[in-house]
């Protein structure tokens, strides 16, 4: 079923007017939502644990409190802390301070959909999920545009949850460019699948495998890096701007012919079956439980995965090549730590 794009004109009720808003977390999404909402005239406070994010929020001019204090003061509470810490944060500091008629929001449905967080029946639960990272949500807002967003209602205790969700999306600039209504189930499962099978897991595995095939065949690692990784952005930018059609119109006939001939040899029916298995593990909660259990155990799996990835030859080759290419962007690993 096709969904209809909605815009600022479709946001009929200023549901956030007169409400005290608490943004919980001041990371990637937190800093963007809070600053954009403030700039659109809303009353925003920050709830965050002591540390760099707390200090940054105060530096940016926000009244900043502990999570518990911010929850007590607020009518609408948006939880933008990392997925893996939301459950303990909610149970320890948010749940004891909620009141009937409050609204609790999320930018991703993970903890609600998989029932790690259960909100009382007399509290609204909504979602505003921008389809872009926080720095882009903020930058495009400042440029007069925005990032499209999904919105959803999981629990409508007051009858106002949808209006709150849409007005939140408007407040961060998303309604300038388009909103799509969804459900917590749909957003959560599709988002995780996209990340794992295509955008992050699938893409990095494809690049690394291509690099291995070339280097194992005797080609220079530096040249292999350019062919399978460096040029990826050039192709993705074309697809982003105009779909497969623009990309194919922009490349050589040789490249286009090879696209049609060899793409299906790489992404076979077996790969599609593997993708379906990934989706099944998302749908049945296996991935969610594995992720949360690893976090509760001290992240042994995630730590091991990170160490293994850091030692890949393609990473070492790329690090050296990028030193000679300042035009590719920020090389400082600490650049966005305050917002992650």
Swiss-Prot record:
Pathway field: Amino-acid biosynthesis; L-isoleucine biosynthesis; L-isoleucine from 2-oxobutanoate: step 2/4; Amino-acid biosynthesis; L-valine biosynthesis; L-valine from pyruvate: step 2/4
Enzymatic class: oxidoreductase
UniProt binding sites for Mg(2+) 1: 191, 195
Coiled coil region boundaries: none
Enzyme Commission numbers on file: 1.1.1.86
Cofactor needs: Mg(2+)
Annotated ranges, domain KARI N-terminal Rossmann: 3-182
List of residues binding NADP(+): 26-29, 49, 53, 83-86, 134
Binding site for substrate: 252
GO cellular component entries: cytosol
Keyword line: Amino-acid biosynthesis, Branched-chain amino acid biosynthesis, Magnesium, Metal-binding, NADP, Oxidoreductase
KARI C-terminal knotted domain segment(s): 183-328
Record: active site: 108
GO BP terms in the entry: isoleucine biosynthetic process; L-valine biosynthetic process
A family per Pfam: KARI_C
GO MF entry, a single one: NADP binding
Binding site for Mg(2+) 2: 191, 227, 231
Cofactor remark: Binds 2 magnesium ions per subunit.
Annotated catalysed reactions: (2R)-2,3-dihydroxy-3-methylbutanoate + NADP(+) = (2S)-2-acetolactate + NADPH + H(+); (2R,3R)-2,3-dihydroxy-3-methylpentanoate + NADP(+) = (S)-2-ethyl-2-hydroxy-3-oxobutanoate + NADPH + H(+)
Biological role: Involved in the biosynthesis of branched-chain amino acids (BCAA). Catalyzes an alkyl-migration followed by a ketol-acid reduction of (S)-2-acetolactate (S2AL) to yield (R)-2,3-dihydroxy-isovalerate. In the isomerase reaction, S2AL is rearranged via a Mg-dependent methyl migration to produce 3-hydroxy-3-methyl-2-ketobutyrate (HMKB). In the reductase reaction, this 2-ketoacid undergoes a metal-dependent reduction by NADPH to yield (R)-2,3-dihydroxy-isovalerate.
Family from the record: Belongs to the ketol-acid reductoisomerase family.
Protein name: Ketol-acid reductoisomerase (NADP(+))
Source organism per UniProt: Streptococcus thermophilus (strain ATCC BAA-250 / LMG 18311)
């Amino acid at each position: 079923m096709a969904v209809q794009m909605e815009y600022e004109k479709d946001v009929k009720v200023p549901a956030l007017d007169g409400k005290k808003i608490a943004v919980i977390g001041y990371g990637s999404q937190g800093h963007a939502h809070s600053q954009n909402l403030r700039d659109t005239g809303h009353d925003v406070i920050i709830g965050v644990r002591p540390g760099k994010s707390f200090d940054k929020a105060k530096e940016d001019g926000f009244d900043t409190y502990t999570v518990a204090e911010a929850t007590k003061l607020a009518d609408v509470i948006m939880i933008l802390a990392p997925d893996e810490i939301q459950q303990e944060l909610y149970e320890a500091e948010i749940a004891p301070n909620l009141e009937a008629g409050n609204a609790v929001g999320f930018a991703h449905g993970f903890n609600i959909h998989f029932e790690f967080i259960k909100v009382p029946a007399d509290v609204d639960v909504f979602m505003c999920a921008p389809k872009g990272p926080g720095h882009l949500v903020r930058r495009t807002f400042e440029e007069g545009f925005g990032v499209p967003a999904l919105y959803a209602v999981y629990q409508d205790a007051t009858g106002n949850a949808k209006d709150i969700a849409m007005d939140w999306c408007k407040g961060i600039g998303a309604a300038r460019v388009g909103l799509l209504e969804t459900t917590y189930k749909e957003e959560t499962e599709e988002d995780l699948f996209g990340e794992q099978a295509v955008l992050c897991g699938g893409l990095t595995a494809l690049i690394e495998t291509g690099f291995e095939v070339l280097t194992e065949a005797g080609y220079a690692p530096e040249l292999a890096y350019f062919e399978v990784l460096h040029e990826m952005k050039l192709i993705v930018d074309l697809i982003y701007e105009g779909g497969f059609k623009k990309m194919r119109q922009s490349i050589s006939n040789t490249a286009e012919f090879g696209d049609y001939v060899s793409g299906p040899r790489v992404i076979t029916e077996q790969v599609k079956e593997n993708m379906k298995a990934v989706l099944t593990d998302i749908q049945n909660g296996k991935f969610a439980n594995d992720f949360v259990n690893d976090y509760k155990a001290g992240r042994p799996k995630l730590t091991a995965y990170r160490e293994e990835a850091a030692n890949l030859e393609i990473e070492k080759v790329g690090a050296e090549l990028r030193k000679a290419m300042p035009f590719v962007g920020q090389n400082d690993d600490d650049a966005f730590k305050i917002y992650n």
